[in-house]
Design a protein with these regions (language model features):
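N-terminal type II signal-anchor transmembrane helix
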Residues: 1-39
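Short alpha-helical segments used as structural interaction elements across diverse proteins
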Residues: 3-4, 46, 319
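Short low-complexity stretches enriched in small and charged residues
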Residues: 8-12, 39, 79-81, 118-121, ...
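N-terminal start-of-chain detector that recognizes signal peptides
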Residues: 12-17, 60-61, 84-86, 136-140, ...
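Signal peptide-directed extracytoplasmic domains
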Residues: 25-191
């Protein structure tokens, strides 16, 4: 009897150990990808159960039995830790490595750069060109989009901070825009808290508008504070800003790259030649330096500036001096190259 019980015991042990050892061996073997594929993308939606995740791995093209992978999720103790997200299964990935990756949320990240000085139309185009983003915003009007981001009634122009953003493949472009919006909030608040007594703008919103103009007008970083000084000085005395980038913005997509006199006379809400004060919204995304320049202008009496042709600007306190600078740098022919 004792011998019989011993055999039963060891048989039971074998029934547990052998399959367990086999599963452990299997979990550390590379997963089979389709011929010629170096990687596969796996998207897991929030709330997906472990069994459905195992099936999603197989559906992505991995040569694996979902039931076996599901058992590994359970026996490894990680079934309840599996996270939603976008993952990349590369050649050589084992079931054990894949499970750890999903449990730790090690998503496959992509990047998208939003460039200083871009307008909202360019941001929309960049989002649409990003195939790894879920384009939830593309069917939304600007009003509906800002409503979805929690800013009803706010125009989207200038509300997003220019930077390089990482995102998981398959994530929503609304999530990326929300991060960019909060980043702009943070940078604008920091600049506003450090504003100079010389700054004329009365609200953070006005500072954002002015910063967007400074961003578009600045050719060299060294001139940024002086350009801000010119605009602050003009606002202080009620002088029109007369800034070309705002006029161009008001012309919209129809602008052909050549700003004509008739354009300067075309009265739009953004024509700072025909209207006093700031335009109604930003005209682009200002970067950090432009935000700070808007609220910390250089101390000067300059009211005019003109491009020298090398990226820098010449500043003047009087119209006569400005006209001479225009003749010197823009109207007079440049000397022939030696």
């Amino acid at each position: 009897m004792r011998a019989f019980l011993s055999r039963v015991f060891w048989a039971a042990v074998a029934l547990v150990i052998v399959p367990g050892a086999a599963l452990l061996w299997w979990a550390n073997q590379p997963l089979q990808l389709p011929a010629g594929a170096n990687s596969l993308d796996l998207s897991i939606e929030p709330g997906t159960k472990p069994a459905a995740i195992a099936q999603a791995v197989a559906d992505a093209g991995v040569g694996v039995q979902p039931q076996l992978l599901w058992w590994w999720f359970r026996l490894s103790g990680q079934a309840r830790s599996l996270r939603a997200g976008g993952y990349e299964i590369t050649s050589g990935t084992t079931p054990a490595r894949l499970t750890r990756m999903i449990a730790r949320g090690e998503e496959s990240l992509r990047t998208l750069g939003l460039i200083d000085g871009w307008n909202w139309r360019q941001v929309r185009q960049a989002l649409a060109r990003s195939p790894d983003l879920k384009n939830d915003s593309q069917t939304l009007s600007d009003d509906a989009l800002m409503q979805a981001l929690g800013r009803p009634g706010v125009a989207p122009e200038g509300q997003f901070y220019p930077d390089t953003y990482s995102y998981a493949k398959g994530s929503s472009d609304l999530a990326l825009l929300r991060r960019a919006m909060h980043a702009m909030d943070t940078h604008l608040a920091a600049a506003w808290a450090a504003r100079s007594p010389d700054a004329v703008v009365q609200t953070p919103g006005q500072a954002l508008i002015l910063a967007s103009i400074i961003e578009k007008e600045t050719g060299r970083a060294q001139d940024r504070a002086m350009i801000s000084s010119v605009f602050n000085n003009r606002l202080r005395i009620g002088m029109r800003l007369q800034t070309d980038p705002s006029v161009i913005y008001g012309l919209g997509a129809g602008f052909d790259g050549n700003l004509r006199k008739v354009d300067l006379l075309n009265d739009t809400p953004y024509n700072t030649y025909t209207r006093a004060g700031l335009p109604p919204t930003p005209i682009a995304m200002p970067g950090k330096a432009a935000l700070w320049a808007a609220v910390q202008p250089a101390q000067s009496k300059a009211l005019y500036f003109v491009a020298r042709g090398d990226g820098t600007s010449a500043f003047s306190e009087s119209l006569d001096a400005h006209n001479r600078a225009v003749v010197q740098y823009q109207l007079r022919k440049q000397p022939a190259a030696k």
